[in-house]
């Protein structure tokens, strides 16, 4: 957790340099515990994503972990603000995480957001239509609220946290 301009926030992230930033059972438990604390204190959750997705070595434990994250997100929906920033890969089951948040930001050049890789779609190739890039996700899918460089995204998130109420019972914002 931390503070942005006096506002308590809870932040989680994936480090792509460690196991590709993949999510397994223990990483998911940290995220779900963070959601529990955020709900208890009525503070926003910010996710910073650069991940290969599911940790395949953990098989069904990792799949269950994704389900636990989704459940916490749905319980938090409408109660606390949820913000996601995608700075690298956000694929497979992890692609649902930004879809379940209130605000989604994407880095404009290297971020990719997809359930299935664009080449997995019949008749599509990345050279024809990259359905995973920020422009497509913003303009066509309507999932992304802001595209920019990492520093711009972090600045926009700080501004957003200062404008939003901390939770559904906050009358001070």
Segment roles from a protein language model:
Residues 173:
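Active-site loops and adjacent core secondary-structure elements that bind or stabilize anionic groups
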Residues 1-77, 82-83:
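Long, structured ligand/cofactor-binding scaffold of large enzymes
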Residues 49-169:
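Conserved catalytic cores of soluble enzyme domains
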């Amino acid at each position: 957790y931390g503070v942005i301009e006096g506002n308590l926030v809870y932040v989680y992230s994936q480090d792509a340099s460690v196991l590709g930033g993949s999510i397994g059972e223990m990483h998911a438990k940290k995220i779900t515990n963070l959601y529990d604390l955020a709900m208890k204190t009525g503070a926003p959750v910010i996710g910073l994503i650069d991940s290969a997705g599911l940790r395949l070595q953990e098989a069904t434990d990792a799949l269950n972990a994704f389900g636990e994250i989704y459940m916490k997100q749905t319980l938090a929906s409408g109660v606390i603000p949820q913000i996601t920033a995608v700075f690298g890969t956000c694929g497979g089951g992890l692609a649902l995480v930004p879809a379940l948040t209130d605000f989604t930001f994407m880095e404009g050049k290297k971020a990719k957001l997809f359930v299935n890789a664009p080449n997995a779609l019949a008749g599509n190739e990345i050279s024809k239509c990259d359905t995973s890039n920020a422009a497509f996700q913003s303009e066509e899918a309507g999932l992304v609220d802001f595209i920019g460089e990492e520093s711009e995204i972090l600045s926009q998130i700080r501004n957003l946290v200062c404008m939003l109420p901390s939770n559904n019972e906050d009358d001070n914002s």
